[in-house]
Amino acid sequence: FIVETLMAVYRHNGLLKGSIISATNAHRLGANEAPPAIISSFLGKQLTDLLKSLEESYDDALFNLKGKKALKLDIPQIPELLLDNTDRNRTSPFAFTGNRFEFRAVGSSANCAAAMIVLNAAVAESLADFKERVDRLIAEGMDKMKAIVKVVREDIKTCQPIHFEGNGYSEEWKEEAARRGLDVATSAPKMFQQYLAPESIEMFRKTCVLNEAEL
């Protein structure tokens, strides 16, 4: 679920920014301890290491083939792991803290409905896409757990550009984000245009949330 949430944020980082933007919020973002105007996600060291291990490990290191197949990630229980390693990077607009993601770019007095509509639709699209790809591999004869791990690995690699652990206020990050292909627009009208991007229209259509005329 974490990986597919990251995929949603990666695919639609520009639209997520469009969902929270206003003239006043555009002025606020990137200053006065507000998150920067580039959407990225902070995970913290242990989750980052876990995803890296999952991406790079050989199948034999991940699976116990004696009896029932099961993942062997060699980590403590997830709730304890995360609660003990809550690292609050305040410069991240979309951070994992403790046991949840926080989308911090919404203005403090703003209605969060638009942001929630976009975020929920984007995650729903990612989860549906994940299931379709896993089902396709299973239909081709692959073991269910191996199919899941294969798709998760692919998505960990694909969404790497959205993952950033550093200082979101730095000029270096703005340049790096542009190189990664992330949306770096700072103009509110340009951010609003993300609602009419082909990938946004398709996402809302597939999830039956909004049609093109409504957008």
How would you describe each model-predicted region?
Residues 1-2, 8:
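Hydrophobic, small-residue-rich alpha-helical packing segments that form membrane-like cores
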Residues 9-215:
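Acidic, glycine-enriched catalytic cores built around paired aspartates
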